[in-house]
Amino acid sequence: MKQLACALVLILCGAGLHALAVQRPAPGGYIIEHDAAVAKNEPGTHNGGGQTIGYSFFSKVPKLGLVFRKRALKPGSGIGLHEQKEDEIYYVLSGTGTMTLDGKTVNVTPGTAVLTRTGSSHSLRQTGNDDLVILINYEAAEPQSR
C-alpha cells in the first residue's frame, strides 16, 4: 500500500510539473484596439496636403518595436514626398491613388502592396471620388518606453 501511495504522489507531482512546463500566454498577453478609439483627423503627412484620418494602433504600448497604422486619405489629399528611414509596407484596402516611387509613378488600387526600402523616396496621392484607405507597417526606429 505504501508503494502505491508513493507511486500516486510521483504521478501527481509529474502531472503538476508538466502543467507548469506547458507555455501559456501571460494574463493580458494581447491588446485589442478599435478604429473609433484611435482615429484622429490630421493633415496629409509629410506635407502631402488635404485631410486624412490617421489610426495609430498600439501607439501607447511600451517597448513595441513595430508601427501599425491605417490612414484614410480624403479626396485630393496625399502623403508628401519623403525619404524612407526604414523598410515600410503600404497595403491598399480601398479607393485609388498614385504612388511615386523614386521618381516613377504607379497606380495603386485595392489589393496593392508596396514595400518601400530604406533610402528610397516615395509619395502617395488619393485619386477618384472615394477615400484611399491604406495600412502602413514598419519597424520602429527605437521601441518606445512610453
Regions found by a protein language model. Give the residues of each.
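A short, N-terminal "cap"/entry segment at the start of jelly-roll beta-barrel domains
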Residues: L17-G65, S145-R146
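Conserved short histidine dyad/triad with adjacent acidic residue
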Residues: V67-Q84
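Glycine- and acidic-residue-biased ligand/ion/polar-headgroup-sensing regions
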Residues: K85-E88, V92-G97, D102
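Short acidic-glycine-tyrosine-enriched beta hairpin
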Residues: K104-G119
